[in-house]
UniProtKB/Swiss-Prot annotation:
InterPro entries: PFN (IPR048278), PFN_euk (IPR005455), PFN_sf (IPR036140), Profilin_CS (IPR027310)
Record's subcellular location: Cytoplasm, Cytoskeleton
Signal peptide as annotated in the record: none
Organism expressing this protein natively: Corylus avellana
Record bears the keyword Protease: no
Stored SMART domains: PROF
GO-annotated molecular function: actin monomer binding
Taxonomic lineage of the native organism: Eukaryota, Viridiplantae, Streptophyta, Embryophyta, Tracheophyta
The protein's name in its UniProt record: Profilin-5
Entry comment on modification after translation: Phosphorylated by MAP kinases.
Length: 131
């Protein structure tokens, strides 16, 4: 299965008639493996800051998580595994695998829990595959 198929079929899938606003799979080096057409144009330093927070949990808390120039307030996550952010009625979930970051961005009516489930389910699957 191509990386784009993982984004299209597993991340941008429909849940209760709704889906993520945007999604992507990005390598730890910041290279895009696959992304939805709606995924924001990001800066390398934004990905570097996210990677740093996985290595040093809490480093994003004072500044927030930035992606595509949008600032998300960092909320509870799983140290070294998942970062979650909130902005207004939407937010972001980032799951780290051994080689990539899985991104899901949502807005209402999708809930934070639905976004977490979509992103973390794929991330857990990829981890089991050694990716």
């Amino acid at each position: 299965m191509s990386w784009q198929a993982y984004v299209d079929e597993h991340l941008m899938c429909e849940i209760d008639g709704h889906h993520l606003s945007a999604a992507a799979i990005i390598g730890h080096d910041g290279s895009v493996w696959a992304q939805s057409s709606t995924f924001p144009q990001f800066k390398p330093e934004e990905i570097a800051a996210i990677i740093k927070d996985f290595d040093e949990p809490g480093s994003l808390a004072p500044t927030g998580l930035h992606l595509g120039g949008i600032k998300y307030m960092v909320i509870q996550g799983e140290s070294g595994a998942v970062i979650r952010g909130k902005k207004g009625a939407g937010g972001i979930t980032v799951k780290k695998t051994s080689q990539a970051l899985i991104f899901g961005i949502y807005d209402e009516p999708l809930t934070p829990g639905q976004c977490n489930m979509i992103v973390e389910r794929l991330g857990d699957y990829l981890l089991k595959q050694g990716l």
